[in-house]
């Protein structure tokens, strides 16, 4: 009999559930954490259980005796998502300094924890927590231990929020839709390399803050689904899902693909007061952001030079190493379809 393939389109992986790497995460009530993890690209499967108690067996009614933590077994494809990135998604939805309490749930069974089965994961976990500690006040209370005495939870608890869409959930599931772009994947080439790699216009725009002509640039009216990356480094910047026609003659976006991939500087050139937008790693001049965008899209207009961007079509994103961002492009298609049908 062949392996049963994971069918959830949000997971981005066709790895059999029995393959991949495994990590066990505790973060309060497991109903919400399980549903949240299932939304993350690269996760193959998530299931609820009880971890690191005193006994080899337990059930929901006996947790106060066995001291198990409500946990989620996460099977993930390391080719799609790293453990470090998975943990950063986990950190988004837990209070890391709270002891035995998450959301409205109080008790030892609701403690936070990361339980590993591969000893090599311990270093990754420790480094991730060290980075997290820099951004939070108070001592981190997330326990880190090798997995022991794990018990799969009762059928009633598995996929609880799928079976009960309006059921209790202390987690904001939308945080799984927030894009994390790894900065260490991208580097800025030397000026010598950039001069060879870029056209004269691309170099002048990105390095010397020039502006290309409106309506005479490559992407201002492009409607194909895909992703726009920094022409100098390849770092993802904008999704077609957030592109709209502002009539200004340059590509316009309601927001970057992640708030972390752009930087801002005051620009008082040309006797105007504007906010310049630069790429995070390449520090390339991209354009400017204005507050005259559509209110229903957040009210911002990122007016970006085509010369600062490289477009990668949806069909090529996987082979060019941007497969992890495909779900956000597809969500954009759905959003656009719904908008068109209701307006």
UniProtKB/Swiss-Prot annotation:
Enzyme Commission number: 1.8.4.11, 1.8.4.12
UniProt entry keywords in alphabetical sequence: Multifunctional enzyme, Oxidoreductase
Active site (record annotation): 29 (cysteine sulfenic acid (-soh) intermediate), 303 (nucleophile)
Domain of life assignment: Bacteria
GO molecular function, one term: peptide-methionine (S)-S-oxide reductase activity
Segments for region (Peptide methionine sulfoxide reductase A): 21-174
Gene Ontology biological-process annotations: protein modification process; protein repair; response to oxidative stress
Stored Gene3D superfamilies: Peptide methionine sulfoxide reductase, Peptide methionine sulphoxide reductase MsrA
SUPFAM superfamilies: Mss4-like (SSF51316), Peptide methionine sulfoxide reductase (SSF55068)
Occurrences of domain MsrB (ranges): 191-314
Entries under Pfam families matching the protein: PMSR, SelR
Catalytic activity: L-methionyl-[protein] + [thioredoxin]-disulfide + H2O = L-methionyl-(S)-S-oxide-[protein] + [thioredoxin]-dithiol; [thioredoxin]-disulfide + L-methionine + H2O = L-methionine (S)-S-oxide + [thioredoxin]-dithiol; L-methionyl-[protein] + [thioredoxin]-disulfide + H2O = L-methionyl-(R)-S-oxide-[protein] + [thioredoxin]-dithiol
GO cellular-component term (any): cytoplasm
Class of the enzyme per the UniProt entry, highest EC level: oxidoreductase
Function: Has an important function as a repair enzyme for proteins that have been inactivated by oxidation. Catalyzes the reversible oxidation-reduction of methionine sulfoxide in proteins to methionine.
Family as reported in the entry's similarity comment: In the N-terminal section; belongs to the MsrA Met sulfoxide reductase family.
Protein name per the record: Peptide methionine sulfoxide reductase msrA/msrB
Source species: Enterococcus faecalis (Streptococcus faecalis)
Gene: msrAB
């Amino acid at each position: 009999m062949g392996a049963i393939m994971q069918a959830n389109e949000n997971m981005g992986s066709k790895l059999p559930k029995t393959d991949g790497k495994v990590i066990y995460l505790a973060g309060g009530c497991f109903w919400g954490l399980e549903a949240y993890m299932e939304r993350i690209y690269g996760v193959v499967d998530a299931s609820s259980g009880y971890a690191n108690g005193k006994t080899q067996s337990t059930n929901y009614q006996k947790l106060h005796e066995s001291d198990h933590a409500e946990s989620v077994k996460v099977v993930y494809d390391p080719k799609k998502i790293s453990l470090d990135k998975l943990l950063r998604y986990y950190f988004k939805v837990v209070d890391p300094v709270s002891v035995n309490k998450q959301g409205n749930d109080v008790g030892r069974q609701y403690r936070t924890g990361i339980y590993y089965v591969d000893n090599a994961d311990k270093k990754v976990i420790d480094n991730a927590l060290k980075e997290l500690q820099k951004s939070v006040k108070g001592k981190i209370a997330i326990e880190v231990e090798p997995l022991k005495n794990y018990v799969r939870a009762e059928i009633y608890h598995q996929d609880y929020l799928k079976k009960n869409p309006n059921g209790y959930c202390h987690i904001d599931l939308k945080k799984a839709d927030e894009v994390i772009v790894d900065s260490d994947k991208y580097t800025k080439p030397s000026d010598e390399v950039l001069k060879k790699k870029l056209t004269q216009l691309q170099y002048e725009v990105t390095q010397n803050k020039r502006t290309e002509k409106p309506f005479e640039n490559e992407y201002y009216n492009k409607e194909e689904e895909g992703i726009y990356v920094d022409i100098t480094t390849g770092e993802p910047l904008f999704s077609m899902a957030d592109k709209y026609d502002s009539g200004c003659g340059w590509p316009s976006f309601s927001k970057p693909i992640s708030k972390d991939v752009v930087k801002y500087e005051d620009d008082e050139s040309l006797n105007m007061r504007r906010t310049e937008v630069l790429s995070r790693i390449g520090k390339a001049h991209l354009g400017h952001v204005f507050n005259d965008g559509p209110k229903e899209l957040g009210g911002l207009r990122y007016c970006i030079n085509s010369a600062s961007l490289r477009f990668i079509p949806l069909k090529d994103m996987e082979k060019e190493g941007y497969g992890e961002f495909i779900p956000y492009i597809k969500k954009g298609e759905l959003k656009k379809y719904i908008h068109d049908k209701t307006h």
